[in-house]
């Protein structure tokens, strides 16, 4: 399990099965198989125990109404918070992908594991189910049925939920409920959640000290025109070798268009990046005139369209924890 050899085998004798009856046996078999999940990852992926948001992880569900729509999220409280070990706590908002859920992304990404080890709060928001009728030609394709999806196109679909308003209400509520360190609020997401992360980065970057979009680059489907409000954004983009689009930085593609945009936005040197490899990770770093890295891109070898706890640890330790954003909007690299 997670590269550690393990197995669990249940054996039922015919006589026992006869005594218990078919219904009980089916119930036990379902309980056995649903206690495990195979999550995406490098190579053959990873088997993990199922972790239920409330029953297993003790997360707290919060519900609010935004523009007449009932919305919710889960909050994970680390032991450091429960024991009152700090006056203020960093916050990570972790956003699920298309047709997924807050509960599903908690299991896949494992951000609560990082939070427990590093002492910060995690919020897993849930998208509102809708069909996406494509009032915007650059939006995601419509769905046959209402499906959880973030209205994250640029510009957003007119007939979809106002996601910026939702995240503003979410952050207001979380800051009212918990002692949040407002200089250390970060956001990450996968796939459609990566699109949402980039939408927040474009339209409402001021509260966030770090961004980590994984599994989708906005230049793949949408025009990457640099924002002009002067706010520095510091994203760490990640794409897998077998992701939705290519992970290559050769030629004109969604990756290069997105990276050129952020370099223009932040005043970074696109043509002379720093590159290095570490195992399956191929890193490209973009720096400003002072030599500070404010954007990075990572291509992951032998990776599908996924997000893993290992990546969550990397993002926090090697990126989020390095940055704070002052109340006046100034972004500071602590490293």
Show the residue positions of the predicted features:
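Histidine-bearing beta->alpha loop at or near hydrolase active sites
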Residues: 279-280, 301-306
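A domain-start/cap signature at the N-terminus of enzymes
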Residues: 4-91, 103-109, 117, 159, ...
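Active-site nucleophile loop of the alpha/beta-hydrolase fold
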Residues: 127, 212-219, 240-243
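Catalytic His-Asp charge-relay segment
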Residues: 232-239, 295-298
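Flexible "cap/lid" loop of the alpha/beta hydrolase fold
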Residues: 217-233
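The conserved beta1-alpha1 loop
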Residues: 93-97, 215, 239
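Serine-hydrolase catalytic machinery in alpha/beta-hydrolase-like enzymes
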Residues: 9-10, 14, 64-74, 87-186, ...
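Active-site-adjacent alpha-helix of alpha/beta-hydrolase-fold enzymes
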Residues: 239-294
